[in-house]
Swiss-Prot record:
UniProt GO MF annotations: transmembrane transporter activity
Top-level taxon: Eukaryota
Keywords, alphabetical: Cell membrane, Glycoprotein, Membrane, Transmembrane, Transmembrane helix
Transcription in keyword set: no
Major subcellular site: membrane
Record InterPro entries: MFS, MFS_dom, MFS_trans_sf
Species annotation: Fusarium heterosporum
Designated name of the protein: MFS transporter eqxG
């Protein structure tokens, strides 16, 4: 049983009620009040057979765990995400060797070795995120890591390209698990005013692009954080101790497992269809995600062809993008939670968009600098400065966008919201880089990157729109999950 760190304030009644209001604004009353005959929910605090937390200071509640326990879980989940994305980006230099070994002459097939892995990021969350909200986060972490390790070994022993590509997409699906449910874990562990730094650490993995060692750490150190699953276990213990078989956890639905699974699987799709907030934020972050992958895959050819870099020194081209992201991450971590705490009155999820409003629009500026200075072969440091601006600006789109979804939909639906985000975002990462060659051949580096910059500019009003009208839209476009 967890112990409460005295340095951490337990959530009081006002925080819990604020969380309930936040849920009502986004997913209607489905998670708070009795519903129709399709799924009656048991949520009567006066019912002696309803098992709930033992007040706001219950040490079993993940919000009351010690700071060490919370941070350990955060680090493990972040390492999962980092390793999953590094497996995509680190393989790119080896694609040519794979093409030689399997006698692949089609460049598109070679590119698919990376793209199919990233496509798995979109497919996996459709099942994994809903399952985590029904059966808990921990079992998904265990299962995904096992499948990932097995099929990564399978990739190493593949005897033909078809086998390799199938194994790669399965690896991508397994790797997507921590990415889609990690936001839910963060929401389980940290109250809204502390999620900025936590989500920044978790989210940086996909921007930098499960392994066996991390899997061992998961088994040893990680515990379940899903509130519903924890209450189910608490009710199960109480039934065993008291002999009262009528005890049920709070917010239990009278549904069959098949009904629960079907409802959970359609959650991400319902969020995309019925919530303009989820759709537009996912499109915006998806374009930036795909843009990063496009730059990753084209840097070597651009700097070798234009500036005569050797294959060894071409790696320096990544410094601008990487340093921009790291600096942006540090600045965001320092400012995000501090700005939220300084707000007068109750903080809104939309307050996470302040930095996105002002700093996100510099991303197109970086693309213009990079494209036109590379086109005219201006000193190589100038286009790298442009990529620094791209990395810095994109950080203030992707991370605030995902934190906004987590804050807006709460722990109960955060995993589904992140799954919806991945469903839109990952295809951009998988396929946008395939357009780089025809784009640059047709338009050149200047206009080619300018087109990408103009597309980014089209989405710059999104955070302004949601900052002003987001709360009203969350109330108007309720999604019954």
């Amino acid at each position: 049983m967890a112990t409460t760190d005295p340095a951490i304030a337990a959530p009081d009644d006002s925080q819990l009620e604020a969380g309930r209001e936040n849920i009502r604004a986004n997913v209607g009353d489905a998670l708070e009040k009795p519903s129709s005959s399709t799924g009656t929910m048991v949520d009567e605090p006066t019912d002696p057979n309803v098992v709930d937390w033992d007040g706001p200071h219950d040490p079993e509640h993940p919000l009351n765990w010690s700071k060490t326990q919370k941070n350990l879980h955060l680090v493990i989940v972040s390492l999962f995400t980092l390793a999953a994305n590094l497996a995509a980006t680190m393989f790119a230099p080896g694609a040519e060797e794979l093409a030689t070994e399997f006698s692949i002459t089609n460049s598109t097939v070679t590119a698919m070795t990376v793209s199919l892995y990233v496509l798995g990021f979109a497919l996996g969350p459709l099942l994994l995120a809903p399952l985590s909200e029904l059966y808990g986060r921990l079992v998904i972490y265990y299962g995904c890591n096992f499948v990932y390790v097995v099929f990564t070994i399978g990739c190493a022993f593949s005897t033909n390209v078809a086998m390799f590509l199938v194994f790669r997409i399965i690896c991508g699906c397994a790797a997507s698990g921590p990415m889609s449910i990690g936001g839910g874990t963060v929401a389980d562990l940290f109250p809204q005013e502390e999620r900025g730094k936590a989500m920044a650490l978790f989210t940086v993995g996909p921007l930098l692009g499960p392994s066996g060692l991390i899997g061992v750490a998961t088994v040893i150190f990680m515990r379940e954080t899903n509130y519903m699953v924890l209450l189910q276990r608490k009710a199960q213990r109480a039934r065993k101790e008291t002999g009262n078989d009528k005890l049920v956890p709070k917010l239990t639905r009278n549904e069959t497992p098949k009904q629960m699974l079907a409802r959970a699987i359609v959650r991400p799709l319902k969020l995309l269809i019925f919530s303009p907030i989820v759709l537009l934020i996912s499109l915006y972050t998806g374009i930036l995600f795909g843009l990063i992958f496009l730059l990753f895959t084209t840097f070597p050819s651009v700097f070798q062809d234009v500036y005569g870099f050797s294959p060894g020194t071409a790696g320096l081209a990544y410094l601008g993008l990487g340093i921009g992201m790291i600096l942006g991450l540090v600045l965001f971590s320092v400012l995000s939670d501090k700005m939220l705490k300084q707000k007068s009155g109750a903080a809104r999820p939309e307050d996470r968009l302040i930095l996105m409003k002002w700093l996100g629009p510099i991303t197109p500026l970086g693309l213009f600098i990079y494209g036109w200075t590379a086109k005219y072969a201006v000193h190589w440091i100038v286009p790298i400065i442009g990529t620094f601006v791209v990395g810095f600006g994109s950080l203030f789109v992707v991370i605030p966008g995902q934190i906004y979804l987590v804050d807006a939909f709460g722990a109960e639906a955060a995993a589904s919201a992140m799954a919806a985000n991945l469903l839109v975002r990952s295809p951009f990462g998988a396929f946008l880089d395939l357009t780089a060659s025809p784009l640059y051949v047709s338009l050149g580096l200047g206009w080619g990157n300018s087109v990408l910059g103009f597309i980014c500019l089209l989405f710059t009003p999104v955070p302004w729109l949601f900052y002003t009208y987001g709360e009203r839209m969350r109330t108007h476009f309720k999604v019954d999950l």
